[in-house]
């Protein structure tokens, strides 16, 4: 394998070399590079908008490494910022071949080839790669979006939105279901993001707050897929809906842990923090330019 180039890849996983990764030669211990690629593979699935465990269960199989080949071109050192790149290069009947590279800036330090086999998790015998998974991998490498956002009424989106919200707010954050659900759902504008398997993975809603002011809330993203673009896509879909109906401003009550997310999307804080449903929140605001 010769060194690879950044422009060959769509997917990058970023990391910094830790002290624990470095050996007595003051370079990354060779075996850790496979761990870097394996960690990046988890992020690759996030980029596909597919929660790994539930997706593979639904597809009736799992992925097993058949072969891993690594070639070392140069060494990474303590505190280096690295980017681990992956690309699905070939899909056979039951196997998938990925090529990978680890970059420091423009320099390719490591290149690799990973071969996975799709197999029955009980018998560990190979099975054909499901057509739906094949299509998703090909679409991702072709640069296509991995999720779509539908904006609509509660009547159309209730089942999917409720499922995502229950997982996040009721099960994960232990908010009583009586507080999570309210009468505003019936008249709110809702948004649901679905992956390419048609599974709802993120949601949010928009309700009137005051004349010309909309309030976004019930923002929830599948736990495994946080840190991707799904939350931002739902947020901007709701902001667009607010603009279209003539709102000049949107506000929201951000959980303190999500304040940075909303700030990156142009929201600013106003007022003091407060507690809501037992969780610290802060009000945030974003001006809009209503559509004419």
Stretches found by the model and what they are:
Residues 86, 221, 227-240:
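Conserved acetyl-CoA-binding loop-helix of GNAT-fold acetyltransferases
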Residues 2-67, 120-143:
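Hot-dog-fold acyl-thioester-processing enzymes
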Residues 275-292:
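C-terminal "cap" of GNAT-fold acetyltransferases
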Residues 117-120, 219-226:
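A short, internal acetyl-CoA/4′-phosphopantetheine-binding micro-motif in the GNAT/acyltransferase core
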Residues 37, 145-179, 185, 190, ...:
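Short amphipathic alpha-helix that is part of the acyltransferase structural core
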Residues 113, 192, 199-208, 212-220:
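Conserved beta-strand in the GNAT
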Residues 235, 242-255:
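Conserved GNAT acetyl-CoA-binding A-motif
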Residues 2-7, 11-13, 72, 76-81, ...:
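HotDog/MaoC-like acyl-thioester-processing domains
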């Amino acid at each position: 394998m010769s060194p690879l180039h950044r422009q060959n890849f769509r997917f990058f996983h970023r990391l910094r070399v830790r002290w624990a990764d470095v050996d007595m030669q003051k370079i990354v211990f060779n075996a850790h590079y496979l761990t870097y690629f394996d960690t990046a593979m988890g992020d690759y699935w996030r980029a596909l908008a597919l929660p790994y465990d539930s997706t593979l269960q639904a597809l009736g199989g799992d992925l097993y490494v058949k072969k891993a080949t690594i070639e070392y071109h140069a060494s990474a050192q303590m505190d280096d910022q690295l980017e681990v790149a992956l690309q699905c290069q070939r899909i056979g009947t039951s196997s998938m071949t990925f090529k990978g590279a680890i970059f420091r800036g423009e320099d390719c330090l490591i290149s690799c080839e990973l071969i996975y086999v799709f197999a029955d998790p009980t018998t560990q015998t190979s099975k054909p790669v499901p057509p739906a998974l094949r299509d998703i991998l090909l679409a991702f490498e072709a640069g296509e979006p991995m999720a779509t956002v539908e904006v609509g009424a509660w009547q159309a989106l209730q089942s999917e939105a409720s499922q995502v919200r229950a997982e996040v707010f009721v099960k994960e954050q232990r908010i009583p279901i009586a507080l999570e659900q309210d009468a505003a759902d019936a008249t709110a504008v809702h948004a649901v993001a679905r992956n390419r398997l048609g599974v709802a993975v993120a949601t949010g809603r928009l309700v009137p707050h005051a004349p010309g002011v909309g309030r976004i809330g019930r923002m929830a993203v599948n736990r495994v897929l946080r840190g991707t673009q799904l939350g931002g896509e739902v947020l901007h879909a709701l902001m667009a809906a607010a603009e279209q109906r003539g709102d000049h401003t949107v506000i929201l009550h951000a959980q303190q842990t999500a304040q940075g997310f909303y700030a990156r999307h142009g929201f600013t804080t106003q007022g003091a923090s407060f507690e809501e449903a037992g969780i610290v929140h802060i009000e945030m605001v974003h001006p809009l330019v209503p559509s004419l």
